[in-house]
Amino acid sequence: MEATDPSAEIELYTIPAQSSWFLWDDIHEIERREFAEFFTESSITRTPKVYKEYRDFIINKFREDTCRRLTFTSVRKFLVGDVNLLQKVFLFLEKWGLINFSSSLKKNDHLLSVDNAKIEQGTPAGIRVTATPNSLRPITAPPLVEERVETGIKVPPLTSYSDVFSDLKKPDHVLVCAHCGERCDSPFYQHNKGIVNICEKCFKNGNYGENNTADDFKLIGNSAAAVWTEEEILLLLESVLKHGDDWELISQSVSTKSRLDCISKLIELPFGEFLMGSASGRLNPSILTEDENTEQVQTDGQEHEETETREEKEDRVNEDEPPAKRKRVALISEGDSSLMKQVAAMASKVGPSVATAAAKAALAALCDEASCPKEIFDTDDYSNFTVDRANGEKDTDMEEQQEEKDGPQGLPVALRIRASVATALGAAAAQAKILADQEEREMEQLAATVIEQQLKKLQSKLKFLDDLESIMDEEEKVIEGVKETIIQERVSVLQCAFRSGITKRWDHTYVK
């Protein structure tokens, strides 16, 4: 037998019959019509040579292992260029059966029984064979099937379960980034026309593709909830402690999340409620807790000093404790706040002068109901007044007992409460009067401003009229001067005529 020349041998490549127009060394008219952008010579990156390199590489990549299905992701890793054009070329070759035609099996083909499997020898009748020139691989005849196999798919001996059935576990529709080729598991950006999807990372890096801008894409939430990183969570907690419940400032601090995302994430955190309570306590230091209010309403000087010392110690302890262990501060408007706490809070919100005026108004109001309301806040005067009033009715011993009983602690509680309530109401009324006076002053100031502007407008009009009058006077003077000049010229003309001997009669005839 004669030795065969390896260079003369060619490689067989099986393609469908409908793709018989395909040639390795040429570009068919169908390809030119489908990819007109490669043949217009509008760009150096879109030429017939570039298209042929794309096509040949994709087909050769599939020929490396025709038993597996070629994906666009595996091709995209080795090619550089416009992702849209690469995907278009890939889909075109797959449509005409130039790739993936022998692996386009249904998902349940591996479950077929032996009776349903059909094995043929040689090339089927509907397949045409074309040759690839300059190939170093010799022609090999298809192996004969000696014995029937159990399944319709032949796999290598060391193939694992995940390699065979990994495609079945994948979802039917996987979103892939058109630029980097990775899956879009997180929220991604979709083109307004719905032709391109890019991941969030590529969008932030500015990889929009050719002839695309950031305005051409819209954010699509692919996952049920946005993914929070540790840095974003720490920034959220810091913003909540700093700004309280001002979600606008919090969302500005956490620039990657919206207000709704920040609220939802804080609700999900196990210590979010305590954190909000701690933030409210820091932002409203004038609002006191129940124990502090109870101690603050004590009127005795010594007990008041002890209360302040105790409160300062508690504040230092609370500052050292973590935010989650702080007690939430009750608001004034809450229903469980006592009357004395509300009175103390209302009185603390006004100035000393307003509080003094309110106290005087409260005493004046109480004078109409009680005979000695003013002496309640002055123990010495109240005791002396009681002694003078009781003179003649009780003896000296009874007067001494009365003096011992009367004092700061001997005053009726109901009268104290009424005095405190009247003081708070008077403070509120005084504050309202101050606000009303302030509004009235502002109205007077605005009215004065309007009057001043009207006066300025009137002055400008008067000035304009004065200027106009001066201009008219100047024009009148000019006209008078012109009149005098004309009269003088006429007189001179008549004098010249008389000197030349023109008679009066001739003059009249000439004139007629």
Swiss-Prot record:
SMART domains given in the database record: SANT
PROSITE patterns in the cross-refs: SANT, SWIRM
Tissues with expression: Expressed in roots, stems, leaves and flowers, but not in siliques.
InterPro entries given in the database record: Homeodomain-like_sf (IPR009057), SANT/Myb (IPR001005), SANT_dom (IPR017884), SMARCC_C (IPR032451), SWIRM (IPR007526), WH-like_DNA-bd_sf (IPR036388)
Residues in SANT domain copies: 223-274
Coiled-coil residues: 424-488
Keyword set, alphabetical order: Activator, Chromatin regulator, Coiled coil, Developmental protein, DNA-binding, Nucleus, Transcription, Transcription regulation
GO cellular component terms, A-Z: SWI/SNF complex
Ranges where the SWIRM domain occurs: 13-110
Transmembrane annotation, as ranges: none
Keyword field contains Coiled coil: yes
GO biological process: chromatin remodeling
Consequence of gene loss (knockout): Plants have an embryo development blocked at the early globular stage.
Annotated region (Disordered), positions in chain: 291-325
Compartments, as annotated in UniProt: Nucleus
Keyword Lipid metabolism: no
A Pfam family annotated for this UniProt entry: SWIRM-assoc_1
GO molecular function list: DNA binding
Description of how the protein assembles with itself and partners: Homodimers and heterodimers. Interacts with SWI3B, SWI3C, BSH, and the C-terminus of FCA, but not with BRM or SWI3D.
Function: Component of a multiprotein complex equivalent of the SWI/SNF complex, an ATP-dependent chromatin-remodeling complex, which is required for the positive and negative regulation of gene expression of a large number of genes. It changes chromatin structure by altering DNA-histone contacts within a nucleosome, leading eventually to a change in nucleosome position, thus facilitating or repressing binding of gene-specific transcription factors.
Protein name: SWI/SNF complex subunit SWI3A
